[in-house]
Amino acid sequence: MKVLLHCQRLRFIWLAKPAGRHFHRDSQLWAPLTLDDFEAINRCEKPLPKNFNFAADVLDQWSLKEKSGERPANPALWWVNGKGDEVKWSFQELGSLSRKAANVLTKPCGLQRGDRVAVILPRIPEWWLINVACMRTGLVFMPGTIQLTRKDILYRLQASKAKCIVASEEVAPAVDSIVSECPSLKTKLLVSPHHWDGWLNFQELLQSASEEHNCVETGSQEPMAIYFTSGTTGSPKMAQHSQGSLGIGYTLCGRYWLDLTSSDIMWNMSDTGWIKAAIGSVFSTWLRGACVFVHRMAQFDTDIFLDTLTTYPITTLCSAPTVYRMLVQKDLKRYQFKRLRHCLTGGEPLNPEVLEQWKMQTGLELYEGYGQTEVGIICANRKGEAIKPGSMGKGVVPYDVQIIDENGNILPSGKEGEIALRLKSDRPFCFFSEYVDNPEKTDATIRRNFYVTGDRGVMDDDGYFWFVGRADDVIISSGYRIGPFEVESALIEHPAVVESAVVSSPDPIRGEVVKAFIVLAAPYKCSNREKLTAELQDHVKNSTAPYKYPRKVEFVQELPKTITGKIKRNVLRDQEWGRA
């Protein structure tokens, strides 16, 4: 494949000024930022550059290293689907194709810098192309899982005022059914070999697009992406991240938690709709010049998963605890993993038993990390440090992680409280910028001089953090964040339901699952409970993303409530977890 490279490197220089040093590009003394520079910025040893663009300042630099022989012959992206199809792109090929994709977005799609683009695609190579193309053009990338329903998509398009949606055939019918209710939406771009009435065809436009494209010089704190994050009340919030928070903020994660080099091949199992895909399948991995490996499976299968680890030279694996719980039930000693050396997990608490079984069968440690959509990785178990089974590890640079009480006072070790990040004079650049159009929720994350995560935990005498529970009642099942309000809202639409309360319930495979406590309407109180349970579960699957449906249902006469009438979910949750 012919690749056209930029003739001119994007470079920076330090300029001393009375107000403090900053980066400036208008000088013949420019020099490209290096990994050491990015690490120094993360440690607050150097200021954030005024301008930064991940495509130009990271990906294109790896293209140049690749061309000059300074990088191993390792793909930038390696995609397979188990059916014989395979895609391998070098950084140079990724650069060329993403420039063509950038021209598709700006010319036939008519998008301009700052426009928001909803992207609902499965794990296909085009997801990465669109992602990088948005970086090159200064568009705001908004990913979503293909499990989103019509109602979910409608909310996201209306709330974000998206100008464009990029989607696959699985999603196109749902989009067409609500497009008349989305006045901001101007363009529908289909990623498919087939044509669809009213949609532009990405593959067709990509073939004819020019490889010549000048990358937009974006500001470091300019919006780059928006992630919809679930909460316990109201609709999902829009957490906005900047070019710098994502593009530079995951440098230390790539080195110290993922332990990546440019020779590594990283397989991150996260769905494309979540920020974990950005962490492990874009920023942390490509900052280190490593290869992103992707296997698109129609559905998760332990045998296919293990065969993949055996067949391909994957060095680094990151997946939800649910996957490891399923894997340790197999005889792993039968498998010979070619190069696997580093295994990670996150997204929900990991059972100590699974960690121990994984090590016993594979000889490999399992390094757990804890983070949030808003601020990235907060705690992690890292190589070179002792692992305490069940612990989330220690706080990571640049964060000062503390346990605080409701008044913002730091609690001593061994005392349960809220997990919080102590702030200095300035808000860390690796934080999310804001909840879009929701200043109250944004402000509510700060208590005195702390960012409060909404999660509860304990720090031991050695500085290790232990997860206790979510203060905001969000359920994490198989790595998916599920807001109880969304499930309750779906249930209440069914005529059998008077009211409901949704909480987490322990599950040996998924860690926790959604459980609904339901008060029935009078006409349904004598119904067949088994049939009604199945009917309600199907109702939720059809009303919202299927992974949110309650796997457990209990019918009750009444729900526990406070004196003001608020449902006491904590009582029900404690009952489920045996802590009542």
Curated annotation (Swiss-Prot):
Classification via Gene3D superfamilies: 3.30.300.30, N-terminal domain of ligase-like (3.40.50.12780)
Annotated GO biological process: acyl-CoA metabolic process; fatty acid metabolic process
GO molecular function: ATP binding; decanoate-CoA ligase activity; fatty acid ligase activity; fatty-acyl-CoA synthase activity; metal ion binding
E.C. no: 6.2.1.2
Gene (UniProt): Acsm4
InterPro entries: AMP-bd_C, AMP-bd_C_sf, AMP-binding_CS, AMP-dep_synth/lig_dom, ANL_N_sf, Mitochondrial_ACSM
Domain of life: Eukaryota
Known role: Catalyzes the activation of fatty acids by CoA to produce an acyl-CoA, the first step in fatty acid metabolism. Capable of activating medium-chain fatty acids with a preference for C6-12 fatty acids.
GO cellular component entries: mitochondrion
Keywords, alphabetical: ATP-binding, Fatty acid metabolism, Ligase, Lipid metabolism, Magnesium, Metal-binding, Mitochondrion, Nucleotide-binding, Transit peptide
Top-level class of the enzyme under EC nomenclature: ligase
Family of the protein in this entry: Belongs to the ATP-dependent AMP-binding enzyme family.
A Pfam family assignment: AMP-binding
Reactions mediated catalytically: a medium-chain fatty acid + ATP + CoA = a medium-chain fatty acyl-CoA + AMP + diphosphate; hexanoate + ATP + CoA = hexanoyl-CoA + AMP + diphosphate; octanoate + ATP + CoA = octanoyl-CoA + AMP + diphosphate; decanoate + ATP + CoA = decanoyl-CoA + AMP + diphosphate
Disulphide linkage map: none
Name of the featured protein: Acyl-coenzyme A synthetase ACSM4, mitochondrial
Binding site for ATP: 229-237, 368-373, 455, 470, 566
Subcellular location(s) of the protein: Mitochondrion
Cofactor: Mg(2+); Mn(2+)
Main localization (coarse): mitochondrion
FT transit peptide: 1-22
